[in-house]
Amino acid sequence: MDFIEAASLLDGPLYRGDPDSSSNRQMYAANRERQGSDMQYSKEEIRQYVAEEDIKFIRLAFCDLSGRQKNISIHPDELDRALQYGIAFDASAIPGFGDEVRSDLFLQPDTSTLCLLPWRPDHGRVARMFCGIVRPDGTPFEADARQLLRQAVREAEDMGVTFAFGTEMEFYLFQRDELGEPTKQPYDHAGYMDIAPEDKGENVRREICLTLEQMGIRPECSHHEQGPGQNEIDFRYSRPLTAADNAVTFRTVVDSVAVRSGLAADFSPKPISGQPGNGMHINISAKSADGADVMPLIIAGILAHIREMTVFLNTVDASYLRFGGSKAPRYISWSSENRSQLIRIPAAQGEYRRAELRSPDPLCNPYLAFALLIYAGLDGIRRALPLPAAADINFFTASQQVKERFETLPATLPQARALAAGSPFLAELLPPAVLEYYTK
C-alpha cells in the first residue's frame, strides 16, 4: 500500500454512536465506496442517520479568511432546504467577505463531512457538516478558502500529482483564575516528553485524542513539548481537504476539552516570552501518476516562494517572534533530519517519506496554507526548478558569516505583507479580496 492509498483510508465520513446501529453500518459501507472520491451522501442517507442518532441540531460550519471556524445551527426540519438550496447568512458581518451591498451568501453542506460532536449531550445530539460558500446564483464564492483548496487539488490532479498533508500541532494549556478567565499561568512545568506526575496535561491530551477518534480523526502520537504547559499532537497524512478540515476540527476539540477541564488552550505562536512558541509543522507528501520522483521539484518550488507566502503561514505579529529560536526556522534552507532547517526530510522511507515545513504556526488558515503549498510545488514541477544543495549545518550554533549566505524569512508582519502584496505569483492565484485581506 502506498501513501496515497493509505491516506484514502483515513478520509471519509465521521460518525459516532453505536457501531452496530444500522445507520452507522450503512455509513461505513458507503464510506468504503467513497474512499478517494468526492462522492456525497444522499439526502435519504443523511435523513436516516439524523433520525437514528437522535440529532436535534446540525451545525453548518465554515471558516473566515483568517481560518477561524464559524457556524449556523439548524434544526433537522431545515435539512432538506439546506441540502437543496443552502442556508443564507450575512456576509457583511465576516471580515473580508464583502459589504452591505452584496451581503447575501449561502452555506452549501458537504455531506461527506457529517459528524457527531462527542462533547455534546447524548440525547438531542449535535452534528456538524463543513460547507462550501456560494453566491445566490449558485456560483462559488471566490473568497471561500475551502473552495480555493479544492481548486488547487484539481489542478494538481490535472498534472498527475496527488498530494497528502499531515500536521504537528502545538498548544499551551493555561490555568484559569477564580472568575474563570484565562491566565498565563502554565498548567504544569514539565519538559520535553516528560511523563506524569510532572506532565499534568497527559489526561487532557488523552481526552482530546479519544474525542478525535470518536469523530473519525486518528492522531498519530501525542506528548508534552518543551515549554511549561506546552503540548503536541501529531496527525498522519490525509488528502489535502480532509487534512485541512481535521486541523480546524482539532482546534475546536482542544478548546472544548480544555474548557471542560477548567483550563484554557492557547494556539498563539508565542504565548510566553522567553519560552518556545507554538508551531504547526506541515508534512507534505506527493505522488506522480507517471512514477517520477517529484518531491525535489516540489521542495524547490516551496523554497522559491516561501518568502511571499509567509504572511499566509504566519499571520500575526507574534508569529515573527518565534522565528530563529527553540527549533523554529529563520533561514530558507533544507536538509535531512536537521531540525534547524526550514524544510526537513525526516529519516523515513516508503509511504512515510515526506518533507516537513517547520515555519507555519497554528493560527494560519489551513485551507489557504495547503493550497499555496500545492501551487508552489506545482510551479517547481512546471519550471523544473533545481533543488539547492542541502544545508547540513546547525543554524542555532552556526557563525554569522555562515548564516549570511542564506536568505531569511520575513522578520516582521509588515515585511511579510509587503512581500505578498508585490508577488506576481500570488496575484495570479488568489482572488483580490483574499490577497487584500492579508496584505492591508
What is each stretch, according to the model?
Residues G36-C221, A243, L297, E404-K440:
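ATP/Mg2+-dependent ligation/transfer catalytic cores
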Residues V257, L263-A264, K287-K440:
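Catalytic-core signal marking the mid-to-C-terminal active-site face
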Residues A61, N71-S73, F130, Y172, ...:
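Structured core elements
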Residues D64, V134-P140, P197, Y237-A243, ...:
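A generic structural motif
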Residues Y172-I272, P276-A289:
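Helix-rich catalytic cores of soluble enzyme domains
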Residues D2, Y15-D20, N24, N31, ...:
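Intrinsic-disorder-associated, low-complexity terminal segments enriched in Asp/Asn/His/Tyr and depleted
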Residues P118-R125, F163-A164, S222-G227, G274-Q275, ...:
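Short glycine/proline-enriched loop/turn "hinge" motifs that connect secondary-structure elements
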Residues E5-A7, G12-P13:
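Positively charged N-terminal leader segments that act as targeting/secretion signals
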